[in-house]
A protein has these predicted regions:
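Membrane-embedded alpha-helical bundles of multi-pass transporters/translocases
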Residues: 1-381
Length: 381
């Protein structure tokens, strides 16, 4: 059953990643690897930074084990109060952070980018103001999707990427002539709205209702925040690397930061299709096995997951490294995407490919530590 679910999620993720490549192809064809795309990718890294930090990363992995234990200890009705408190706290926090991003967009970009060209900086500044509230919608989506996965409603949660990519693709094509790169920013924001909206029907099937409760004294809320601290430190360490990479890239000739992004999309394809699909399906099974103290199931699931991952990732790594230039040419070289952009992007992709197996394995191993409430090793890694 676990690997049947994994296969379904992999198929959906494969479709999502293919659409992701189509999205990048369209962005590359319409805008190329230029100062304008550097501004767009730099602006969207800021809400993405906070989203990974508080939404997709720490909250999802901390929230589900506590939720499952709460149901075992006190029943679903009591544990639902915990869910409502978490979601309402997210709304308050992310709304505040999004407003701060808008108010202090210039100061943030001066820290995270190295734009010397005033035009690129001003474009990034306006784009950051447009996409800031993406953080609110996608952080909520991160918790809601974790809840759906826990109830084995994998297909809807896995389809978030499809909605994201379709929104960007359609938005770019519809708005490119009237709004240029700013149309891309608007499509990016709308994708967050649509991802959350898509999951709400199944969320209400599980929860039945919604309560605007803030219970900061809830024992499960307190425990969640305590467990989040080391997780946040670990994720922050990784995310800050991306911000630093982008800062250095924006100090180089126009288009360098965009080439870095285009290469990372190809590198993230096998991670998204294989590593994340397996991790998403395995995590609820591990969490429930730990609650019932079934260590035999935990060992079996982790071992099977690692073997399956290696079988899928090693060939992917070899292909990406050996055929980097051909792949980049096939996918990106059209419209405004030049031969110079192909060379920079393919060389970057080869370096990414070397670390593919190791980075993919982290997705599985960190979750196996999280279910035991072990945050130390993931933070160190």
């Amino acid at each position: 059953l676990m690997f049947k679910s994994s296969f379904i999620v992999m198929i959906i993720n494969m479709l999502s990643r293919i659409l992701g490549l189509v999205r990048e192809m369209i962005i590359g064809s319409v805008f190329g690897a230029t100062g304008m795309t550097d501004a767009y990718f730099s602006a969207t890294k800021i809400p993405n930074f906070f989203t990974t930090l508080f939404g997709e990363g720490s909250l999802g992995t901390v929230f589900i084990p506590i939720y499952n234990r709460g149901i075992e200890e006190q029943g679903k009705e009591r544990t639902d109060e915990f869910v409502f408190s978490v979601l309402n706290l997210i709304v308050a926090f992310t709304s505040t952070m999004s407003i701060l991003m808008i108010l202090f967009s210039r100061q943030i970009l001066k820290i995270t980018t190295g734009f010397a060209d005033p035009e690129r900086f001003e474009t990034a500044n306006m784009l950051l103001k447009i996409v800031a509230f993406y953080f609110l919608f996608i952080a909520l989506s991160g918790v809601v999707s974790s809840l759906l996965n826990n109830y084995k409603k994998f297909a809807v949660a896995a389809s978030m990427g499809i909605v994201f990519n379709l929104t960007i693709i359609i938005g770019t094509l519809l708005l490119k002539n009237k709004m240029g790169i700013y149309g891309l920013g608007i499509a990016y924001l709308l994708s967050g709205v649509f991802q959350l909206a898509m999951m709400l029907p199944q969320f209400f099937q599980i929860m039945k209702t919604y309560k605007f409760t803030f219970n900061l004294k809830d024992e499960y809320v307190i425990e969640m925040f305590k467990l989040m601290i080391p997780t946040l430190i670990g994720i922050f360490g990784y995310q800050i690397n991306e911000i630093i990479d982008n800062r250095f890239a924006t100090m180089l000739p126009a288009g360098t930061a965009s080439a870095l992004n285009y290469a990372s999309r190809l590198y993230l394809l096998p991670i998204g299709v294989f590593a994340i699909s397996l991790a998403v399906v395995i995590f609820p099974t591990l969490s429930k096995a730990v609650v019932k103290n079934n260590m035999k199931t935990v060992r079996r699931v982790v071992h099977q997951g690692l073997y399956m991952l290696a079988f899928l990732i090693v060939p992917s790594s070899v292909v990406l490294f050996g055929y980097a230039q051909e792949i980049v040419t096939l996918i990106y070289k059209r419209g405004h995407f030049s031969e110079k952009s192909v060379v920079i992007t393919s060389e970057t992709l080869q370096f990414y490919a070397i670390g593919l197996l190791f980075f993919s394995t982290i997705h599985l191993l960190t979750r196996s530590h999280y279910v035991f409430k072990d945050r130390t090793l993931p933070v160190i890694s």
